[in-house]
Amino acid sequence: MKIYFLLGTFLTFLLHTRICQGIKWLALSKTPLSLPLNQTQHCKQLEGLVSSQMQLCRSNLELMQTIIHAAKEVKKTCVKAFTDMRWNCSSIELAPTFHQDLERGTRESAFVHALSAAAISHTIARACTTGDIPGCSCAPIPGESPGPGYRWGGCADNLNYGILMGSKFSDAPMKMKKSGSQANKLMHLHNSEVGRQVLKASLEMKCKCHGVSGSCSIKTCWRGLQELREIALDLKTKYLSATKVVHRPMGTRKHLVPKDIDIRPVQETELIYLQSSPDYCLKNEKIGSHGTHERQCNKTSNGSDSCDLMCCGRGYNPYMDKVVERCLCKYHWCCYVTCKKCERTVERYVCK
């Protein structure tokens, strides 16, 4: 009986830690530029797609270059956003196979799913405005007036189309019948929606001035999205305050509820995760930790990049680094600036 109990416990653990295939499509970032994407059979050569995404590729071939670009943006933006953290998103480069930091329902996995969902919709919305996607153009002009001295013009980012097509592609793996545990599906669908909510909230009015001698008597305005790096920073804030959840029966169905705060439901605006993460101090590829040995740290910082936090109390080593920068700049009439290149030595620090 004890053996059966342990086996059941182990299988339950696997069901709740194995991820569905939600972010394997990030492997598209490795697609060679030489690969043509002008015929449906080319979809078979794309890495990381599940069958439903493959079908979307065949029926929406014109979107695939944009989606490939989105995968590259996710990787670049994630690494940039976490450059000051112990977990620095470097394992995202392993797509379509990952270590446990992204293979399990972790806080890190929550962030990457949210960013991926936001990025694909963001990239498609922007591609519509630049004319890169046939059959999709600028967003419609809003019905309400922008206000006195303002007028609608320019080319607004087509957010509605971006979310429509982006969610079809990025959510497709989680909606497959055989794609991991129900708990993981619910978690990743929730976090993907949080990413899209942050994207929607980033839509803002942007304007250009018109008038005699730059008087700006009239402003032409449109609605545009913030840069993906700004959206990533908003999601990073949510990552830091993410809520741990459990898959628990409520009524006739199971739902994700906060593990420690059973009196309230999961908030639609917060990232959620099922499995706690390690501290990422020491290298352990089995759990997806690259460690912080030889990571650069900031001796004077009080943040996550400080040498105390980044190095996990192991201490740090100084080294001297040469920096070349512009200096002795002069303005010449009219109208250009010339500078010289100066070299200086700065002290930097890496973790022991």
UniProtKB/Swiss-Prot annotation:
Q: Which domain of life is it from?
A: Eukaryota
Tell me which CDD domains the record gives: Wnt_Wnt11
GO molecular function terms attached to this record? cytokine activity; frizzled binding
Localization, per the record, is: Secreted, Extracellular space, Extracellular matrix
Residues bearing attached sugar chains per UniProt: 38, 88, 298
Q: Which cysteines are joined by disulfide bonds?
A: 78-89, 128-136, 138-155, 207-221, 209-216, 281-312, 297-307, 311-351, 327-342, 329-339, 334-335
Q: Which residues cross the membrane?
A: none
Give Gene Ontology CC terms: extracellular region; extracellular space
Lipid moiety-binding residues (O-palmitoleoyl serine):
213
Signal sequence extent:
1-22
The record's annotation in SMART domains points to:
WNT1
Swiss-Prot/TrEMBL GO biological process terms:
canonical Wnt signaling pathway; cell fate commitment; dorsal fin development; embryonic axis specification; gastrulation; heart morphogenesis; negative regulation of canonical Wnt signaling pathway; neural crest cell migration
Note, other: Xenopus and other lower vertebrates contain duplicated wnt11 genes resulting from an ancient gene duplication event, but the second copy has since been lost in mammals. This gene was originally called wnt11r. but was renamed to wnt11 to reflect its orthology.
What does the function comment of this entry state?
A: Ligand for members of the frizzled family of seven transmembrane receptors. Shares much functionality with wnt11b. Signals through a non-canonical Wnt pathway to activate Jun-N-terminal kinase (JNK) to regulate gastrulation movements. Acts in a non-cell-autonomous manner to control neural crest migration, probably acting as an extracellular signal from surrounding tissue, but is not required for neural crest induction. Acts redundantly with wnt11b during pronephros induction. Regulates cardiac morphogenesis through the activation of JNK, but is not required for cardiac differentiation.
Q: Which family does this protein fall into?
A: Belongs to the Wnt family.
State the protein's name. Answer: Protein Wnt-11
Organism annotation: Xenopus laevis (African clawed frog)
Question: Its encoding gene is what?
Answer: wnt11
